[in-house]
């Protein structure tokens, strides 16, 4: 089945951020997300899931092991299981990105 943000399951998180489930299986998920300027998720980690964040448009900041790493269009970053991380948008424009998780993060999100 052909999938895009036009026909994918949509959800809102953090009151102002968008997510679209492009692939939603227990063994893997791919989500396209949009975070507006100033938006952020809370710091957390996953016990099992390994994630890869890939910037499609704009730039975002990943807090990872005490560092702030700026990711720009065409750049990605792997987050291993059990590593605290936080994605935020400190720019003046929306950031669009993919989050690929193996296995799915459903039920595997821990807020320290």
Regions found by a protein language model. Give the residues of each.
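A short, N-terminal "cap"/entry segment at the start of jelly-roll beta-barrel domains
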Residues: 1-29, 42, 109-112
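Short strand-connecting beta-turns/loops that link adjacent beta-strands
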Residues: 27-28, 48, 92-93
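Conserved short histidine dyad/triad with adjacent acidic residue
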Residues: 31-46
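Glycine- and acidic-residue-biased ligand/ion/polar-headgroup-sensing regions
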Residues: 48-50, 54-60
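Cofactor-binding loop segments of dinucleotide-utilizing enzymes, especially the Rossmann-like FAD-
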Residues: 57, 65, 100-102
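Structural motif
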Residues: 59-61, 68, 84, 94
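Short acidic-glycine-tyrosine-enriched beta hairpin
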Residues: 67-81
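Ligand-binding loop in jelly-roll beta-barrel domains
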Residues: 81-107
